[in-house]
């Protein structure tokens, strides 16, 4: 889930699509599911267009950026569907940027509600250069070692969903916000500096320009095919416990959407059994439906990677309420204001 420049990509109807394919649906999405050729988004958007005649217009940006854009367009909405990650989806709901919509599949998806639904499971992860480091950093304390000075970087909380997840993971791993902030203040001595993009850090790790960075499991697994020196790890706390914050892709219908019915159709399409079954095969993600268990090698690799790692999630509504204050405090303790 990297934060890229907000880019507009239009996914046009297949040549075989019906001649009545004049209607459109516009998606504002966090990135990660449209990476590379034959991505899950690309395959599903093409199939949706072929089945319905509705063209998908796709706008991509960071988790916070796409929500900020929706807020700016509140009086004249341009998007129909929002895909982002916690806590930004909760912020969108609190700011009344999402419309009430009960999907056809809500009963099969844990944590779905009348404003948004999980779309693809995902988890915070960390990566290291396995060519330059014989073993992964075992603990959070290891990351404070002087050998990582200017060789460690994580994306900026508040801008990137994965960067925000690092901050929240520190709270969890150290037992409190105060302890988490104290640690992040110390870690700043090794941090290269702010990064608006999580995804671009992978190439830097692969080339050895930095040794360690943050990421997310789905994105990192997909990137490892093109970045052979990169491996995934999770640092342990002082009890030796490794944990990973669950940060799913989440989808919702935009309040006042210009093509609301088309938005509903696309949401239901992406949450269908057929679409969910292929998310691991095409994009290394994990389906959110309780009645879908893929059998492909990508799914097996993702589940194997998480062995011995405890997944967790906070009360996201509480996180959304305190997010602005937490981001301000992060800037203060890291002296990055």
From Swiss-Prot:
Location in or out of the cell: Periplasm
Gene Ontology biological process terms from the UniProt entry: thiamine transport
Swiss-Prot/TrEMBL keywords: Periplasm, Signal, Transport
Record keyword Protein transport present: no
Secretion signal, residue range per the UniProt entry: 1-21
A matching Pfam family: SBP_bac_1
SUPFAM superfamilies for the chain: Periplasmic binding protein-like II
InterPro entries found in the cross-reference section: AminoethylPonate_ABC-bd, SBP
GO molecular function annotation: thiamine binding; thiamine pyrophosphate binding
Induction details: Induced when inorganic phosphate is limiting; this is controlled by PhoB.
GO cellular component term, pick one: outer membrane-bounded periplasmic space
PANTHER family with a match to the protein in the record: THIAMINE-BINDING PERIPLASMIC PROTEIN, THIAMINE-BINDING PERIPLASMIC PROTEIN-RELATED
Family: Belongs to the bacterial solute-binding protein 1 family.
The protein's role, per its UniProt record: Probably part of the PhnSTUV complex (TC 3.A.1.11.5) involved in 2-aminoethylphosphonate import.
More info: Maps to a phosphate-starvation-inducible locus previously known as psiC.
Protein name: Putative 2-aminoethylphosphonate-binding periplasmic protein
């Amino acid at each position: 889930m990297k934060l890229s420049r907000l880019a507009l990509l239009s996914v046009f109807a297949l040549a075989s699509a019906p001649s009545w394919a004049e209607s459109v649906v516009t998606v504002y999405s966090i990135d990660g599911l449209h990476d590379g050729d034959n991505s899950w988004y690309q395959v599903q958007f093409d199939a949706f267009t072929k089945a319905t005649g509705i063209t998908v217009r796709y706008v991509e940006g960071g988790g916070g950026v796409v929500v900020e854009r929706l807020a700016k367009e509140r009086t004249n909405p341009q998007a129909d569907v929002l895909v982002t990650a916690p806590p930004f989806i909760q912020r969108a709901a609190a700011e009344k940027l999402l419309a009430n919509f009960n999907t056809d599949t809500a009963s099969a998806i844990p944590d779905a509600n009348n404003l948004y639904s999980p779309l693809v499971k995902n988890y915070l992860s960390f990566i290291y250069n396995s060519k330059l480091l014989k073993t992964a950093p075992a603990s959070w304390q290891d990351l404070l070692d002087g050998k990582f000075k200017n060789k460690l970087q994580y994306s900026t909380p508040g801008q990137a969903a994965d960067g925000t997840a690092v901050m929240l993971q520190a709270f969890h791993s150290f037992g409190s916000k105060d302890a988490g902030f104290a640690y992040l203040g110390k870690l700043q001595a090794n941090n290269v500096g702010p990064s608006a993009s999580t995804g671009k850090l992978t190439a830097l790790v692969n080339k050895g320009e930095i040794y360690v960075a943050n990421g997310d499991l789905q994105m990192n697994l997909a990137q490892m095919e093109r970045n052979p020196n990169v491996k995934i790890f999770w640092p342990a706390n002082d009890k030796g416990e490794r944990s990973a914050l669950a940060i799913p892709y989440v989808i919702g219908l935009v309040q006042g959407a210009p093509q609301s019915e088309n938005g509903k159709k696309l949401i239901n399409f992406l949450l269908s059994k057929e679409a969910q079954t292929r998310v691991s095969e095409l994009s290394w993600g994990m389906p959110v439906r309780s009645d879908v268990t893929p059998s492909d090698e990508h799914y097996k690799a993702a589940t194997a990677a998480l062995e011995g790692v405890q997944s967790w999630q906070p009360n996201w509504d509480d996180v959304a309420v305190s997010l602005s204050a937490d981001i301000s405090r992060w800037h203060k303790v890291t002296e990055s204001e």
